[in-house]
Each structure stands twice: as structure tokens, then as C-alpha cells.
Amino acid sequence: MTRDQVLQIMKENNILPEAGFGQNFLCDEEIIDGIIDAAGIKPGDTVLEIGPGIGALTQQLSSLDINLICVEIDKRLVSYLRKAYPNTEIIDSDFLKLKDYGAEKIDVVISNLPYYIMTDIMMKVFEEAVNARKIVYMVEEAALDRILCESSTKSYGPLAVVSELYGNIRVVTKVPGTCFVPQPRTTSAVISIDCHDNRPDKDLIVFIKKCFAQRRKTLSNNLKGCDKEKLNKWVKDNFIVENIRAEALEPTDFRDLFNTLK
């Protein structure tokens, strides 16, 4: 979908981007092709597109031999998408509030993530799309630091830990603001996640969040109610410092500790 096509659709359907939803419509066919290639979609796959917007990706995805599910919060866009792609399932909902969408059947997830709800959407997908093979996101370039950062850094938190445990992450390409309508001031990046078979389940993800509940507190203080004897022994066996915080742990340490405290 080109810039002219996006502008024409906006004009014909009286659609203006809604700042409250963080809407910037992708309009670069090379980037669109790159995202779909990175998704590694196979015939018969069930593909979830979160926030299809004006349909830049939907246009190509709907032509493939797949089961495509799109979730869109903006009712104006839902109306347009249902007319433009009548054979595609368009769910009118806030994805973060959505419950029954067949999450366990999803093979591939694709989304252009608004920065302000990026973490919430990623965590929900991690918890619910338990059989997904591949995940491809467009994020603000500045947000990469929260996904790919190392332990003991300021940005290190549950998102980085779960992302690392969930799969192999690769930065596919950088996307300048000129590839969107309207043009944002920031650069974006496309990332792909090849999901591991032994990815963290919801219980482990909840545990990781709990470890970081209050960053300045020690693990012992954040993990109230756990077996303190087991926790203290695990810390003593693995670290020099006893009053350790979650930010000092490597991603694999969280799984080890979780299994220890079961």
C-alpha cells in the first residue's frame, strides 16, 4: 500500500489519524514486504494482526492462504476494514481487554505497536499465544533498549527478561518516519521473535513481574509469601551478595529460581 493509496482511503472514508490511539499508518511497500517475509507465514497458518489500522499489512495478508484475525480498537477503521476485507475476521475490540479470540490456535502474531501500550500488548501475547511460532512487531527504535537490554542496567525489567526467555530476537530493519502517514518524529524498528518450544508459561511470567514489583527492593522483599529458606539458599548458592535485587539476575536465573520455589 503506497502513500497515495493511504491518503485516498483516508479521504474517501473520512478517516483522520487518532492521536489517542497512537495512529501512524504505514505506507511503504518495501517495509510491508519485509514484515511479511520476516513472519515466515505458511499456508494454513492462523495469523493474528493487532491494530491493522488502515490495512497496509492486511491488504497483503488477506490474499494469502491463511486464517487471518484482525483486532482493531478504532470503530471507524473497523467499519472500513470490514467493507474492504469481507472475508477476514475483524474483531472490534481493545486487544488488552479481549478474551475469547482463540489465542492457543495462533501461529503468527504481527503488530505495529503504539509505544504507550507496547509492554502491555507484548506481555499479553507472551502469556496467551502459547503456541505461536513467530512474532513480528514494529516498535519505536528507542523502545529496543527495553526489549534487548542486559541485566543490571536501568532499562532491564520484566519485558527484557520474558522476551529473552521466549525466543530468539532479531532486529529486521529500521523504519524512518517518512514511511508513515502522518509522519512521526521518531524512527521505528521491526523485530522478529522465533519462539522457543520451552517458552515461559503464564505462571513464570507472573513470577518475573513479581520479582520486579518494586525495583529498589530485594528479591526477598518482593517475594513475600515464598519459602524464605529456599530463597536464601538459592541466593547464597548463586550470588556473592545476599541482599540481591531482581535487576542483577540473568533471564535464565528467574526460571531456575521459579523452579526452586515451586
Regions found by a protein language model. Give the residues of each.
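Generic C-terminal helix-cap and adjacent flexible tail
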Residues: 260-262
